[in-house]
Swiss-Prot record:
Organism, as annotated: Danio rerio (Zebrafish)
Membrane topology: Single-pass membrane protein
A cellular-component GO term for this protein: cytoplasmic microtubule
Primary role: Involved in the degradation process of misfolded endoplasmic reticulum (ER) luminal proteins. Participates in the transfer of misfolded proteins from the ER to the cytosol, where they are destroyed by the proteasome in a ubiquitin-dependent manner.
Region called Disordered, residue ranges: 1-20, 58-190
Gene: vimp
Taxonomic classification: Eukaryota, Metazoa, Chordata, Craniata, Vertebrata
Record's protein name: Selenoprotein S
GO biological process terms on file: endoplasmic reticulum unfolded protein response; retrograde protein transport, ER to cytosol
C-alpha cells in the first residue's frame, strides 16, 4: 500500500502541464517527406472520382425522369413509329424501283445477246463470217458519225523539232541539265 501511496504522491507532486502535439512533429514530417506526393495524388484522385460519380448519377436520374416523361407521352411515340414506318416504306419502294430497272436492263442485254447469237447462226448457215458482218455494221456507224461532223482535219505541227535531244541539252531554252555534285552536301570528310 505504501508503494501505491508513494506513486500517488509523485503524481501529485508534479504540477499538471499542457501537453502539446510537438512530439508528433518529427514523425509527421518524416511521413509527409516520404509519402506526401502519394497522399496528394490520392486525394486528387478521390476528388475526381467523386465528381465523376455525381455527374453519372445525375445524368441517370435525368434520363430516367425524361424516359418516364416520354413513356407517358404515348402520342409522340405513336407518331414517331408511324414516321419511321413511312420512311422504311418509302426506302423500300425506291429499292424496288431500282431493282425493277436493273431487271429490265438485264432482260434487254439478254435479248440483245440472244439476237446476236441468232444473227451469227444465220450468217454461219449462209456461209458468211459473223465478224465480217459486225465490221460492216461498225463501218456504217462510223460513216454516219463522220458525215455528221463536217469539220476538216488540219495538219498538226510536231511538238519538238526533229533535232531535239533531251540528253544533249541542245535547243534547251533557259534551263539545261547539269550533273549533281559529288560528295556529302554538308561537307566534312572524316
Amino acid at each position: 500500500m505504501e508503494a501505491e501511496d508513494g506513486a500517488r504522491v509523485r503524481n501529485e507532486d508534479v504540477p499538471p502541464q499542457n501537453q502539446d502535439l510537438s512530439f508528433l512533429q518529427p514523425s509527421v514530417t518524416a511521413f509527409m517527406s516520404e509519402y506526401g506526393w502519394y497522399l496528394l495524388f490520392g486525394c486528387v484522385g478521390v476528388y475526381l472520382l467523386i465528381q465523376h460519380l455525381r455527374k453519372s448519377r445525375s445524368s441517370t436520374q435525368t434520363r430516367s425522369s425524361s424516359g418516364s416523361a416520354e413513356a407517358h407521352d404515348v402520342g409522340s411515340v405513336v407518331r414517331r413509329q408511324e414516321a419511321l414506318e413511312a420512311s422504311r416504306r418509302r426506302m423500300q419502294e425506291e429499292q424496288d424501283a431500282r431493282a425493277a430497272e436493273f431487271r429490265e436492263k438485264q432482260r434487254m442485254l439478254e435479248e440483245e445477246k440472244r439476237r446476236q447469237k441468232i444473227e451469227m447462226w444465220d450468217s454461219m448457215q449462209e456461209g458468211k463470217s459473223y465478224k465480217g458482218s459486225a465490221k460492216v455494221a461498225q463501218q456504217n456507224t462510223e460513216e454516219a458519225a463522220s458525215s455528221s461532223s463536217l469539220r476538216p482535219k488540219t495538219e498538226k505541227k510536231p511538238l519538238r523539232s526533229s533535232g531535239y535531244s533531251p540528253l544533249s541539252g541542245d535547243a534547251g531554252g533557259s534551263c539545261s541539265w547539269r550533273p549533281g555534285r559529288r560528295g556529302p552536301s554538308a561537307g566534312g570528310u572524316g
